[in-house]
């Protein structure tokens, strides 16, 4: 249900703003989006897995907070990120 180390490293490299950047909102949102997509696929076959569903809801809330923060600080970066990730906002 989680993403692999290689997938996480690829996301960090793709969305990092500078070398060694793992904590920027862009990287965090990209990793959360990947984990959310993985869990969404999991729920297609495990409809009654409510413990994981709670984790999914917490991840969605965390992503929402990070996106709101980014929109408040720099709206240009926010719009570029949601366009790259294909999020509907």
Curated annotation (Swiss-Prot):
SMART domains, per database record: Ribosomal_S15
UniProt keywords, alphabetically: Ribonucleoprotein, Ribosomal protein, RNA-binding, rRNA-binding
Xref: PROSITE patterns: RIBOSOMAL_S15 (PS00362)
One annotated GO molecular function: rRNA binding
An annotated GO BP: translation
CDD domains: Ribosomal_S15p_S13e
Name of the protein described by the UniProt record: Small ribosomal subunit protein uS15
């Amino acid at each position: 249900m989680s993403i692999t180390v290689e997938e996480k490293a690829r996301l960090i490299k793709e969305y990092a703003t500078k070398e060694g950047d793992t904590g920027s909102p862009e990287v965090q949102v990209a990793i959360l989006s990947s984990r959310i997509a993985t869990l969404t696929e999991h729920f297609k076959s495990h409809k009654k897995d409510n413990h994981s569903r709670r984790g999914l809801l917490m991840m969605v809330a965390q992503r929402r907070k990070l996106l709101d923060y980014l929109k408040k600080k720099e709206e240009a970066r926010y719009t570029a990120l949601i366009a790259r990730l294909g999020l509907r906002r």
